[in-house]
């Protein structure tokens, strides 16, 4: 199955304080598409391309019933390729598809598979079932056919079941796109699944039809005290902490040319590390001797594989924070 590699440039990673997922760009709408469950509890996220460039994005529309969310990002994406949506009934059993995304938060990958069922009924909704490898982090990414057309949004896999992944058919996305002509992308909107009304003010029931809205759909996840402490420090350096988030109590950002990583280790220590060089291939003894004996307090020099790091460690306690 040969695909136009350029199409994958429109697939991005979604990062926030809860983890990561995948998304893709629809050029005609200037919106990124992902799963609702990928951004559930977050209004602000960071999008990352294959070259690790990051872009601030806001969640502007969610439909929990369809498990679809739209993101509006800051930046110029006009150079990205246009993703075409497949015809309504173009998926059949045995058809080849590609699942693109960032499984487990790893670099971009594409896995090939076939359609096991074009209309698999699960919890009153139809999904495309595939035997392609689908893992956490793939959610929100695209499923393409052999004509580079979008056939589904990768949604999930059955836990502990190999070769069984599911995608939201492109028909659900088409329906949503047809309704967003008057969408206010400056605010967060929830779409009522009963009457399709867009609701931007926090409500328990839809003001148009009275249908009960999903619980917590307007609620944002709170950061831990430690995360607030770290993000205040990141903000003080002139860096948007939203762009630095790469998971729960974990951040990666650049200060000048240096990459800095902040993370919690074994719930006991907060580490700040920066990779500074790699070990030489020969004559290691002088370098290793220096790493063992150099006085760089309060910092430490260390190794991870062949990468030399400069680190700072602090025990997590109320007194230290």
Regions found by a protein language model. Give the residues of each.
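Residue-level recognition of beta-strand microenvironments
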Residues: 60-62, 102, 118, 146, ...
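C-terminal cap/linker of serine protease catalytic domains
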Residues: 1-4, 103, 153-217
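Long, charge-rich boundary regions
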Residues: 217-282
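Short, internal acidic amphipathic alpha-helical interface segments
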Residues: 269-313
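Short beta->alpha transition motifs characteristic of CBS
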Residues: 35-40, 111, 136, 152-160, ...
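Short, small/polar residue-rich loop motifs at catalytic or cofactor-binding pockets
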Residues: 17-20, 135-139, 161
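Conserved active-site neighborhood of the chymotrypsin/trypsin-like protease fold
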Residues: 8-9, 13-20, 27-100, 105-108, ...
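Catalytic nucleophile loop of clan PA
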Residues: 24, 133-154
